[in-house]
Amino acid sequence: MKNLISLGVFLLILLSVQVNAQEQSVLKIRPTGRILMDGGLFHSDNKNFVDGVAIPDARIGVKATYGKYKAKVDIGYAYGKVSLKDIFVERQFSSHALLRVGNFVHQFGLQSSTSSSMKVTMEEPASNEAFFNSRLMGAMFVYDKNDFFGTASVHVESEALKKKSNELGKMGYGVMSHLVYRPLHDTGRLFQLGISGAYETPRYNSEPTLNHTSFDLGANFPTRIAKVRAVNALIPDAKNLIKFTPEMIAGYGPVALEAQYYYLQVNRKKDFKNYKASGMYGILRGLLIGGNYRYSHTDCGIATPDSGSLECVFGYNYTDMSDTRSHIYGGRLNDVSFTVNYYINKYMIWRFRYSYTKITDRVGFENQSLSAFQTRFQVIF
């Protein structure tokens, strides 16, 4: 932990150099925001799924640039709660390298490059929710040039944004990296291979016997209108967590494929068996209207289609959080989905999604399924 603090101080000093050279720069500020409006019809034996409408995410924020520096502050509102989202400062060292410090989503696989509102499947794959981290306080170095993209991050656990260090009792930390090779990144011709890896120490838990000796991992059913846990694994007596995820993008003309595999292992104390979990998803995309797919270097993935584009997306996700060797049964999830995206203009998107989700082998939870019809109108600026 002391090493991480020392590294953080060094990074802040690094960000502050050459300020005198920036004196002639102009400060530019622009507002940002988003509104998501959802509606859904559900069919399931689980009575927690009730048809309805919702505004699951509304945000307002500001972006600022000053010479080689950029900053962002984003505040969100959902279901009566206000929360802090992106809060960071970054410094551009060249056209290919930057350093970002603050609270933000660190790079780990394909899904980390797009915000929650820009998922082409409307909701992110369950495997990504189960095995990925949300925003974390830390620092990330980014290198982006030609065929290569790479990041390196150090961070503390997510609860560090919500609680003081004496309330946490201890502060978990971790490191992660995302490496990509993309020999084809032209309009209509896309191919990318990548791999991400991460290491974490145990996280905060409100139960004293589990605090910083456990990991609580899981994912909800793919809807934000009703919040229902689909798979969940509590792993006690934990020493650390390691995970990795290979990824692939391939596209030709108006058709593209995205795929990712996840492997996670929690190393445990004493004679307890290590916990292992895995997952994968595949997404097949096609533009019925809108020309060919383009590449986005900033997102390290497929760019958002142009205004007026109409897109169809087929998705499949499998998540396995039940490990017989460690006797921890978090459940197994299968999900198939079909999504239509209409990109109305630069700021507005309409989505329609049908999905079928089946859960099995979760301790204390009956095998069950959910059929869901959902639609979303979103405004982002």
Model-derived features: where do they sit?
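Outer membrane beta-barrel
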Residues: 23-160, 166-203, 286-288, 298-304, ...
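Hydrophobic alpha-helical membrane context
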Residues: 14-15, 69, 365
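A short, polar/proline- and glycine-enriched secondary-structure boundary/capping micro-motif
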Residues: 83, 111-112, 162, 268-271, ...
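Bacterial Sec-dependent N-terminal signal peptides
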Residues: 1-24
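Short, Lys/Arg-rich amphipathic segments at extreme N-termini
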Residues: 13, 58, 62, 378-379
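Short hydrophobic/aromatic segments of transmembrane alpha-helices and their interfaces
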Residues: 3-4, 54, 131-132, 331-332, ...
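Outer-membrane beta-barrel pore domains
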Residues: 46-47, 209-381
